[in-house]
Amino acid sequence: FMLLISFIDIYFNIMNIKSSKELVKEANETIKIMSPKQVKSSYDKGEVTLIDIRDIRELWKEGTIENAIHIPRGMLEFWLDPQSSYYQEKKIGNIKNIVLFCALGLRSALATKALKEMGFDNVANAEGGFDSLKKAGFKVIHKEKK
C-alpha cells in the first residue's frame, strides 16, 4: 500500500499535476468571495442573481435556493457565452451580478474563476456553498424530477 502511495506521489510530481485542492486555493486567491450574510443582504435588495451549479441529482435530493437559476457546472461557460450554440438567453436574461454556489463552495470557486477568465467582472462565489446559504436564511425549495 505504501508503495502505491509513493508511486502516486512520484507520478503527480513528475507530471506536474495539480490537485483539486490546489486549484481551488488558487481560484480563491483571484476571485470575489461573498459571505452568506453578504449574499443574503444583496439578494434581498435584488442586487444579485444566484446560480446553482450543482448536478441535477443534488437538487432532487437536497433542494435549491428559491429563484436560483440552475446551470449544471459542465454547461456553465457554454450557456453564458452568447457566441455558443448552447447560449441560454431566455434562461439567463439580463443578469447584472452573479453569485455562484455549489454544495460547499469548491466547484463554484473554480466556476467563478472560469467566468472571470471569460470576461465576467460581476461574478462572485458564495462562501460555504448551499449548506451555508441555507443557514443564512435562504428559502429552500424542492426540485421535482422530470
Segment roles from a protein language model:
Residues F12-V48, I56-N97, L106-K146:
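Rhodanese-like catalytic fold shared by cysteine-dependent sulfurtransferases
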